[in-house]
Amino acid sequence: TIPTAISFDTSADENACANVYIHDDIDCSEAMSAYIYYSAAATSGDVTFDIDYVSKASGEDVGTTVTDVAGTATTTNGTADVLEISSAYSIAADACANGDVLFLNVRRDVSAADDMSGDADMYGVRIDYTTRPSVKE
């Protein structure tokens, strides 16, 4: 069946990773925003996602410290299995460079703020960014 999701359990912090190539027309001097698309069978409660990220170029050590962006609790809308979108997670300006790979780790943070029962099903992550103008001579 379609769509396919990654399910995050309610009993322990669980992760999913994605890697995004930072192409030349992205303006890396501007912050980017990430949004998590998800649903849940639960009709009440709050879910909390965190995002960790690091950006690396070819030849750089990928085993370095990541930046953690803690999420805020998002309240379910009261209807089961409805596609929801998280609030924005900021990826800092100058955190990436053109030609880098942005490594993202999305985690359901089952802390005290996350009290939604059952799985949170993640369908994807949207990255919003600013482009640089192209000048051709």
Predicted regions and their residues:
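Extracellular carbohydrate recognition and processing domains
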Residues: 60-95
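Extended, low-complexity, turn-rich repeat/linker tracts enriched in Gly/Pro/Ser/Thr and Asp/Glu
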Residues: 26-29, 38-47, 57-59, 112-114
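Short carbohydrate-recognition loop motifs
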Residues: 1-12
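Cysteine-clustered segments with highest specificity for TGF-beta superfamily mature ligands
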Residues: 84-112
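Short beta-strands within extracellular/lumenal beta-sheet-rich domains
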Residues: 10-31
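Extracellular ligand-binding interfaces
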Residues: 43-71
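Proprotein-processing/basic-patch segments
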Residues: 107-137
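Short coil-to-beta strand junction motifs in C2/discoidin
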Residues: 32, 43-50, 118-122
